[in-house]
């Protein structure tokens, strides 16, 4: 990928100099991909990207609207950006992302500093939007969230240069009672395989080693576009891309884990023995209230099947504590389910009431109950995670180097196959004296111990270094005021 401007837009300069644009990106990895895509579009049409708010002529806030805390964080970021417009160099404020389809008009009414609203299906027009507002227009570019958008254009990575998220679809056809994503992102739309593989090749050419495959519902991939599940075939195609070393799967709906998909995990070395399965609860009664199409017994059988077919598979899941209708007995069933499944990594979230959802209209549990149940579930999982980590002691694992560790000279930090970036812990390891390891190197590490959610180890001798990921010109081009994880 080149970062040279292709066709400069009329609004890309002010007084003979390039317009500088700063980004505030909030929410999940899927939102981050949208931000990276907007940055790529603007850079290739003559704009400069800055990560300093005081330098920005234009600020773009890519919002998250998934839960109340994320919405409040987004509003706070918009208000802080508005201060730069009223007191600083900033001339224009753009609000994009998940809050726009649902709350855009309200935001524009309450925060007059907002010059433009950009819907979740309208990112390809970000250059026109910025040019328009710099020409004195107020712009509302909000298409139907179901509009088909293919992100088959250049991105500028906001992740370290060796790792990239690869979004294979947009939207979701599930109707979970607690979830507002279909209201913000529309129905599921799969990207064509050719488009995804082309992007993977470009990312590999930039030095990316690890692809993290994401969407709102990854295992639904292909059912709309090809009328059959196509995730397994897509993974085989991605595994043929030179330069890619690891392929990691996230957001896998459990009822669509096929034997073909499991076979790809077993037989394709690049597809990691790692699977993210958002299961949400362990009580059948609560699962019915949530409108989830499976039951706890089926989930447990799936976990057992995966561990039988892929003995060292690392499983991650997410759960909701305090959902409307959840009794103390239901919650105890959730704890029992966690103990039975023994997931390697778990995120437990206190239920958040969302406007426009079925669960949002039900009688709500007190906030203190929801928070207390979340904390109890995480206490149970913490001990499980420690036991699962202990199983890695004595093994020699391939580790992707991320940098030096603050533990001291000769110590480095990286991740193994069972650790997704930013959420699953790391490997802290010691290398032989004088070892020159760089981010993106792959090394063999013998695991010697466990520290909380992290693994400890020593690089084996002779040290095996498998090349170096290319450094990016702009590793972190996104201006972060705050970041919701």
UniProtKB/Swiss-Prot annotation:
Residues 390-461 form the TRAM domain. One of its GO terms (biological process) is tRNA modification. [4Fe-4S] cluster 1 binds at residues 28, 64, 98. GO terms for cellular component: cytosol. It is found in: Cytoplasm. SMART domains: Elp3 (SM00729). Catalyzes the methylthiolation of an aspartic acid residue of ribosomal protein uS12. Belongs to the methylthiotransferase family. RimO subfamily. This is Ribosomal protein uS12 methylthiotransferase RimO. It comes from Symbiobacterium thermophilum (strain DSM 24528 / JCM 14929 / IAM 14863 / T).
């Amino acid at each position: 990928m080149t970062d040279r401007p292709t066709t400069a837009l009329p609004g890309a300069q002010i007084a003979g100099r390039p317009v500088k644009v700063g980004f505030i990106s909030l929410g999940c990895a899927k939102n981050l991909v949208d931000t990276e895509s907007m940055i790529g579009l603007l850079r290739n049409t003559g704009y400069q990207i800055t990560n300093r708010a005081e330098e920005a002529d234009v600020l773009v806030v890519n919002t998250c609207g998934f839960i109340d805390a994320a919405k409040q964080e987004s509003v706070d970021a918009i208000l802080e950006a508005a201060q730069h417009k009223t007191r600083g160099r900033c001339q224009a404020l753009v609000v994009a992302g998940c809050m726009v389809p649902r709350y855009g008009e309200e935001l524009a009414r309450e925060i007059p500093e907002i010059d433009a609203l950009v819907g979740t299906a309208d990112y390809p027009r970000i250059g026109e939007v910025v040019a328009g507002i710099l020409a004195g227009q107020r712009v509302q570019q909000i298409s139907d969230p179901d509009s088909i958008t293919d992100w088959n254009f250049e991105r500028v990575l906001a992740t370290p240069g060796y790792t990239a998220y690869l979004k294979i679809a947009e939207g979701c056809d599930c109707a979970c009672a607690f979830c507002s994503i279909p209201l913000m992102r529309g129905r599921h739309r799969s990207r064509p395989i050719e488009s995804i593989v082309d992007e993977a090749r470009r990312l590999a050419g930039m030095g990316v080693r690890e692809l993290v495959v994401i969407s709102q519902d990854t295992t639904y991939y292909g059912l709309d576009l090809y009328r059959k599940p196509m995730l397994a075939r897509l993974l085989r195609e991605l595994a043929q891309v030179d330069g890619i070393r690891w392929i990691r799967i996230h957001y896998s709906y459990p009822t669509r884990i096929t034997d073909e998909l499991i076979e790809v995990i077993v037989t394709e070395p690049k597809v990691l023995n790692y699977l993210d399965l958002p299961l949400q609860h362990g009580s059948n009664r609560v699962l019915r209230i949530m409108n989830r199409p499976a039951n706890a017994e089926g989930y447990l059988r799936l976990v057992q099947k995966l561990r039988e077919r892929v003995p060292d598979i690392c499983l991650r899941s997410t759960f909701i504590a305090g959902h409307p209708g959840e009794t103390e007995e239901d919650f105890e069933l959730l704890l029992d389910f966690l103990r039975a499944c023994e997931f390697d990594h778990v995120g437990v979230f206190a239920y958040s009431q969302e406007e426009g959802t079925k669960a949002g209209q039900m009688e709500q549990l007190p906030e203190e109950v929801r928070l207390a149940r979340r904390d109890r579930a995480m206490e149970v999982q913490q001990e499980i995670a420690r036991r699962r980590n202990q199983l890695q002691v004595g093994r020699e694992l391939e580790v992707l180097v991320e940098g030096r560790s603050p533990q001291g000279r000769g110590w480095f930090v990286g991740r193994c196959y069972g650790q997704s970036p930013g959420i699953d812990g790391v490997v802290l390891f010691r290398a032989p004296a004088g070892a020159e390891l760089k981010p993106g190197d792959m090394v063999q590490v013998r695991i010697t111990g466990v520290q909380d959610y992290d693994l400890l180890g020593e690089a084996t001798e002779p040290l095996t270094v498998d090349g170096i990921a290319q450094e990016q010109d702009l590793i972190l081009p996104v201006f972060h005021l705050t970041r919701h994880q």
